[in-house]
Swiss-Prot record:
Disulfide bonds join 1-16, 8-20, 15-24. Expressed by the venom duct. Belongs to the conotoxin O1 superfamily. It comes from the Eukaryota. The modification Glutamic acid 1-amide is found at residue 26. It comes from Conus amadis. It is found in: Secreted. Keywords: Amidation, Disulfide bond, Ion channel impairing toxin, Knottin, Neurotoxin, Secreted, Toxin, Voltage-gated sodium channel impairing toxin. Its main location: secreted. This is Delta-conotoxin Am2766. GO terms for molecular function: sodium channel inhibitor activity; toxin activity. GO terms for cellular component: extracellular region. Delta-conotoxins bind to site 6 of voltage-gated sodium channels (Nav) and inhibit the inactivation process.
Length: 26
């Protein structure tokens, strides 16, 4: 999964924590 500040997939929500808004937001 992606860390905060990394680019992410808004559809799959592939962040370790928090939410995805083009980048992961803790």
């Amino acid at each position: 999964c992606k860390q905060a500040g990394e680019s992410c997939d808004i559809f799959s929500q592939n962040c370790c924590v928090g939410t995805c808004a083009f980048i992961c937001i803790e």
